[in-house]
């Protein structure tokens, strides 16, 4: 059985159960001559059980015969950090100048467990440090051990 020839990859962040032919999805898929309606239906069906509207990084593989497949990754760490800190956006200043919220070390550990499949480590402590670094970059103070 031979593999299909890959024409290209498209990286998009799409809200769960919220794929529509409107930009950015429509133009990105239209340039590769992919059936936009079929992608939107398949994506929305695949994300139906998830919380509506959460941002999902998605890698769409487009094949030469205009078919496609897609892989949904976990939401960005910044989304989870903002949710746990109950803020709408991170700090626009440097991390030492403006603290916009707080998260606990346990929150960071919980986010790290959710993000493990997409992080470049298999160690939960290293993953927690990665998430704590993201929190600091956003202007969040990490409290606890």
Curated annotation (Swiss-Prot):
Keyword set, alphabetical order: Methylation, Ribonucleoprotein, Ribosomal protein, RNA-binding, rRNA-binding
Q: Which GO terms describe its molecular function?
A: large ribosomal subunit rRNA binding; structural constituent of ribosome
| Posttranslational modification | One or more lysine residues are methylated.
**Which PROSITE patterns does the record cross-reference, listed alphabetically?**
RIBOSOMAL_L11
Role: Forms part of the ribosomal stalk which helps the ribosome interact with GTP-bound translation factors.
Q: Which family does it belong to?
A: Belongs to the universal ribosomal protein uL11 family.
Q: What is this protein called?
A: Large ribosomal subunit protein uL11
Upper lineage is:
Bacteria, Pseudomonadati, Pseudomonadota, Alphaproteobacteria, Rickettsiales
Task: Supply the gene name.
Answer: rplK
């Amino acid at each position: 059985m031979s593999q299909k020839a890959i024409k290209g990859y498209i990286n998009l962040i799409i809200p769960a159960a919220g794929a529509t032919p409107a930009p950015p999805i429509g133009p990105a898929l239209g340039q590769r001559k992919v059936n936009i309606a079929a992608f939107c239906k398949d994506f929305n069906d695949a994300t139906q059980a998830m919380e509506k509207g959460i941002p999902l990084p998605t890698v769409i593989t487009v094949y030469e015969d205009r078919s496609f497949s897609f892989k949904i990754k976990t939401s960005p760490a910044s989304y989870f950090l903002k949710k746990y800190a109950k803020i709408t956006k991170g700090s626009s200043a440097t991390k030492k100048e403006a603290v916009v919220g707080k998260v606990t070390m346990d929150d960071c550990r919980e986010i790290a467990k959710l993000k493990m499949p997409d992080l470049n480590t298999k160690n939960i402590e290293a993953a927690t440090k990665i998430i704590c670094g993201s929190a600091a970059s956003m202007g969040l103070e990490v409290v606890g051990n």
